[in-house]
Amino acid sequence: MASCAARGPAELSKAQAVRRIGILGGTFDPVHIGHLRSALEVAEFMGLDELRLLPNARPPHRDTPQVAAQDRLAMVREAVQGVACLSVDARELERDKPSYTIDTLESIRAELSGHDQLFLVLGWDAFCGLPAWHRWEELLQHCHILVLQRPDADVEPPDELRNLLAARSESDPTAMSGPAGNISFVWQTPLAVSATQIRQLLASGKSVRFLVPDAVLAYIEAHELYRAPN
């Protein structure tokens, strides 16, 4: 798989020894340009070898997805087709239990070398909600955390996260070293699009062209997804 950032000859031996893998989870109900733009910007800025979009099965802190897991997975696969360094990881959909991020991180970490860097990409709201996550204090044992910044964020982090940021924050995300253990912030292009908005438009019979990739729109139309009940 092609890396998101070209490396010069001086970096070749390091690139061979240490892989840089990012994961971006979500229900992707459906996947849209906001998800994809954030993923690509992070991958390119961080020079990741791979950024995996990881569809959630039954996320404990989210509403049940509107369409079946196989449809959401298929749409994500359509969305990243031909995009260098973006890929799909379906492991959470293969579990017959709630999707806990700590389990996923442990599973992925077991497949990597001890030197490989793993980056968990989170939106600001998700990051502020970390203290409600299962075994959240263990996350940084397995990965670095990259928090997507946006100018309209209006959620304040709880005290537990303020303390964690004071101890583990790195001002330059590209300077994070080691396989895991730090938190940093990455700017994202603000795009006012959401899966909820897209579902509402589709249910009302309106077009979502240019809000989702053409291949995803074709899949939605072919399978008659997100239509209002008759």
From Swiss-Prot:
EC number of this enzyme: 2.7.7.18
SUPFAM superfamilies the record matches: Nucleotidylyl transferase
EC supergroup of this enzyme: transferase
Pathway: Cofactor biosynthesis; NAD(+) biosynthesis; deamido-NAD(+) from nicotinate D-ribonucleotide: step 1/1
Example of a GO MF term: ATP binding
A Pfam family hit: CTP_transf_like
Reactions catalysed, as given in the entry: nicotinate beta-D-ribonucleotide + ATP + H(+) = deamido-NAD(+) + diphosphate
Keywords: ATP-binding, NAD, Nucleotide-binding, Nucleotidyltransferase, Pyridine nucleotide biosynthesis, Transferase
Gene Ontology BP annotations: NAD biosynthetic process
HAMAP family the record matches: NaMN_adenylyltr
PANTHER family in alphabetical order: NICOTINATE-NUCLEOTIDE ADENYLYLTRANSFERASE-RELATED, PHOSPHOPANTETHEINE ADENYLYLTRANSFERASE
Family under the similarity heading: Belongs to the NadD family.
Function comment: Catalyzes the reversible adenylation of nicotinate mononucleotide (NaMN) to nicotinic acid adenine dinucleotide (NaAD).
Protein name as catalogued: Probable nicotinate-nucleotide adenylyltransferase
Protein's organism: Pseudomonas putida (strain ATCC 47054 / DSM 6125 / CFBP 8728 / NCIMB 11950 / KT2440)
UniProt gene name: nadD
